[in-house]
Swiss-Prot record:
It is found in: Mitochondrion matrix. Interacts with RIP1. The keyword Mitochondrion applies. Belongs to the complex I LYR family. MZM1 subfamily. Its main location: mitochondrion. Assembly factor required for Rieske Fe-S protein RIP1 incorporation into the cytochrome b-c1 (CIII) complex. Functions as a chaperone, binding to this subunit within the mitochondrial matrix and stabilizing it prior to its translocation and insertion into the late CIII dimeric intermediate within the mitochondrial inner membrane. Modulates the mitochondrial matrix zinc pool. It comes from Botryotinia fuckeliana (strain B05.10) (Noble rot fungus). Keywords: Chaperone, Mitochondrion, Transit peptide. Residues 88-111 are annotated as: Disordered. GO terms for biological process: mitochondrial respiratory chain complex III assembly. One of its GO terms (cellular component) is mitochondrial matrix. This is Mitochondrial zinc maintenance protein 1, mitochondrial.
Amino acid sequence: MALAAYRHLLRATRVAFNEDITLLTSARKQARSTFLANRSLALESPESIAAIAHAEDVAQFLRRNVVQGQKVEGDEKYKLNIHEHTERGDNDTIKMPNGKNVTIDGKTCKD
């Protein structure tokens, strides 16, 4: 389980930081040091299970929610590295915690 979570995390860093070697290297070093720090945990211990779940959550977050951008030379625009794993949504998907739709000036996004 831990090895699979580690591999998922490394793959997610490659997807999220593919163009940025410095950040890719830093993220992988952080993942490695965290896994090495937890190496002595028993496989079925609650701490180990929580650490593996955290690694899987981080991998999922990196894969779906991190998008890097590069400034276009000679322009005030950025080119975003949106990939097939990037979570996409529209304004209709924004919900309040209690399940109500967001309304602005009495209107929803559908109005």
